Amino acid sequence: MLIQEHQPASACHIGHYQRGQIEIDGHIYRQAVLLDGSGSVQTVNLASAAELQAADLARAAASQPEVILIGTGERQQFLHPRIAAAASGIGVECMPTAAAVRTYLLLQSEGRRVWAWLWP
């Protein structure tokens, strides 16, 4: 039986993550990035997930992903409940970036719509 991995056309390929950097589509990023499900990678000028605003999550929710992942770096941090509430019923999951990368890749391989903010 021939088995082939299905990679959605809009998918970003995360090659690896290590403290301080993330490799996405062959490029090394040393600052936070946003993967919005369109296949593009946007750098984010925020020092930590704590700087995310309700408007950021509302913008993500407007595109109706199934889940929003927040990779908070080496240690898990949580968003203020008021910020997370702006996602309008869409699941917001905060976790260390290594776990967020694994979760993103798994959900992406299933063809699920997912947004991710990742801090290296």
Task: Specify the residue positions occupied by each region the protein language model found.
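Non-catalytic interface/targeting segments
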Residues: 1-55, 63, 109-120
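Short active-site-adjacent helix-start/loop capping segments
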Residues: 43-44, 76-80, 103
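Short beta->alpha connector loops
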Residues: 51-52, 74-75, 98
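A generic local structural motif
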Residues: 53-58, 102
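Mid-chain, well-packed structural core segment of small domains
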Residues: 60-95
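C-terminal structural segments of small proteins and small subunits
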Residues: 89-109
